[in-house]
From Swiss-Prot:
Belongs to the fimbrial protein family. Fimbriae (also called pili), polar filaments radiating from the surface of the bacterium to a length of 0.5-1.5 micrometers and numbering 100-300 per cell, enable bacteria to colonize the epithelium of specific host organs. Pfam families: Fimbrial (PF00419). The gene is fimA. This is Type-1 fimbrial protein subunit. Keywords: Disulfide bond, Fimbrium, Signal. It is found in: Fimbrium. InterPro entries: Adhesion_dom_fimbrial, Adhesion_dom_fimbrial_sf, Adhesion_dom_sf, Bact_Fimbrial_Adh_Pro. One of its GO terms (cellular component) is pilus. Residues 1-22 form the signal peptide. PANTHER family: FIMBRIAL SUBUNIT ELFA, FIMBRIAL SUBUNIT ELFA-RELATED. GO terms for biological process: cell adhesion involved in single-species biofilm formation. Disulfide bonds join C38-C78.
Length: 180
């Protein structure tokens, strides 16, 4: 009986001994929080884009669009890397890619049934607000060796209701440049 217990005891002790010899280590996390030197050029920092005057008949159905008006936001003195653009502002309920229009800056009633859509040069729309762009590639530029880059953009009216009413159709949209 002692011959059976002795090997069994040795087996149990060897199994527990390997657990007692566990190794310890350390994980080192490194990184840097950096103040970006990137600047929006003075001529594109506070832009006014005139979208034009259109009759209500130019928006006969939901999704009708006006002509697009081109504009740019240019960056300078940037570190190398990818930068993204985020627009903020009040949006049309159920349409996260449309800025709500109002009569801000004017007198009279605001138009209804339309919003302002901001797109890239290919017509891909930006989501307004939370940074989750409908088309993520829309919002990125890579800084050139000279520290400069330009977002080429367009804006237009787009109807979200089949009953568009006349009035002022103005909106403002603060924007943020983010280092990615």
């Amino acid at each position: 009986m002692k011959k059976v217990l002795l090997p069994l005891a040795a087996l149990v002790l060897s199994a527990t001994a390997s657990n007692a010899m566990a190794a310890n280590g350390t994980v080192k996390f490194t990184g840097e929080i950096k103040q970006s030197t990137c600047q929006v050029t003075s001529d594109t920092q506070n832009k006014e884009v005139y979208l034009g005057t259109y009759p209500t008949s130019a928006f006969p159905t939901v999704g009708s669009k006006s002509a697009s008006k081109a504009f740019q936001i240019s960056l300078e003195k940037c570190d190398a890397g990818d930068y993204s653009l985020r627009f903020d502002g009040n949006t049309v309920a159920g349409n996260p890619d449309l800025l709500s229009v109002s009569n801000v800056g004017g007198t009279g009633a605001a138009a209804t049934g339309v919003g302002i859509e901001i797109t890239d040069n290919n017509g891909k729309p930006f989501a307004i607000g939370d940074g989750s762009n409908i088309n993520d590639d829309v919002a990125k530029v890579t800084i050139a060796a000279d520290g400069k880059a330009t977002f080429n953009l367009q804006a237009r009216y787009r109807s979200f209701d089949s009953n568009v009413t006349a009035g002022l159709a103005n909106a403002t949209s603060p924007f943020t440049i983010e280092y990615k």
